């Protein structure tokens, strides 16, 4: 078995030209990939995305674990994107960062790609403990301004800091922390917490299975969110078009601006929306079970016999707010 010293790569000072396939020891360093649309694949480890200083994508690789020597790195154009792929040995992967009693399973192609929806590849299981290949890869990715990146990570954590470009993140069991992004952002996450701050772009799309979502200072033309379970908090939101669909968990939304359309469908959990005092919208609330409380002047107010629905006009009625809540209180308050 290699010593721990040989398993941890030494980051080279010079930037290396990346061949198609390298052993992990030789691949240690920072690499440049030319293009405008990139895809990065990594099964286990941390991925940090930062602002790049040039015209090319840069990727720094640090291999971890007793079996890190079995990792390989591959590049090249696949499906119209310039790719950087960490290829793991066959068999189960042990990644302690997942947690001792946790595991995730997916299908991985021989070229190291996964989660592209066609369901092909070998079965790979990643566990937090037990027997298997003990290896992971930590990546630091520098994204040039104005470029697009599709990031795939099965287990670990993703952080994004002060990036100017379009970003799509697809993670299995991995936390996501974004602080500073100017561009479109798409997230597809299985389970793990999501934190977003200082986002400004055309579209923001979030699809999560389970885990909390906390966002602050978010500005986008259109925002869509689909959450299976977990509390959702969106604070300081500027958008004219919002669509939120949550299965279970409390929803808190603080709007900075007027809206054209807000649609919110909540299975269970309380819904609290803070709006500007001059917001104008036609309001339609179906509360299911739970109280409905609107603490703003409401014109043309009407409700059914059981008081589990409410309709009316806020302000000039320019926009539209539609809320469908299965169970839990619904409150609309002045910000």
Summary of predicted features, one role per range:
Residues 1-335:
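Intrinsically disordered, low-complexity terminal regions
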């Amino acid at each position: 078995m290699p010593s721990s010293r040989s398993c941890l790569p030494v980051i080279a000072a010079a930037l290396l030209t990346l061949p198609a396939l390298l052993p992990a020891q030789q691949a240690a360093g920072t690499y440049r990939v030319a293009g405008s649309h990139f895809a990065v694949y990594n099964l286990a480890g941390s991925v940090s995305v930062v602002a790049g200083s040039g015209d090319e994508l840069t990727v720094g690789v640090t291999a971890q674990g007793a079996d890190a020597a079995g990792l390989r790195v591959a590049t090249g154009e696949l499906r119209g994107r310039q790719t950087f792929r960490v290829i793991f040995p066959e068999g189960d992967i042990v990644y302690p960062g997942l947690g001792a009693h946790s595991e995730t399973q997916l299908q991985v192609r021989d070229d190291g790609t996964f989660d592209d929806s066609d369901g092909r590849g070998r079965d790979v299981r990643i566990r937090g403990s037990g027997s298997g290949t003990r290896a992971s890869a930590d990546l630091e990715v520098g994204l040039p301004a104005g470029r697009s990146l599709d990031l795939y990570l099965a287990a670990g954590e993703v952080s994004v800091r002060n990036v100017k470009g379009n970003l799509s993140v697809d993670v299995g069991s991995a936390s996501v922390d974004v602080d500073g992004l100017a561009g479109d952002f798409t997230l597809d996450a299985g389970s793990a917490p999501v934190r977003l701050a200082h986002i400004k772009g055309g579209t923001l799309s979030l699809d999560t299975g389970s885990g909390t979502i906390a966002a602050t200072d978010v500005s986008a033309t259109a925002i869509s969110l689909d959450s299976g379970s977990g509390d959702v908090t969106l604070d300081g939101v500027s958008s004219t078009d919002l669509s939120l669909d949550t299965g279970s968990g409390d929803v808190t939304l603080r709007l900075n601006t007027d809206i054209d359309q807000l649609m919110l469908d909540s299975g269970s959990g309380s819904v609290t929306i803070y709006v500007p005092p001059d917001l104008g919208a036609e309001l339609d609330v179906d509360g299911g079970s739970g109280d409905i409380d609107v603490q703003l002047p409401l014109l043309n107010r009407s409700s059914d016999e059981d008081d589990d629905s409410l309709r009316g006009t806020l302000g000039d009625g320019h926009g539209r707010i539609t809320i469908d809540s299965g169970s839990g209180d619904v409150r609309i308050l002045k910000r």
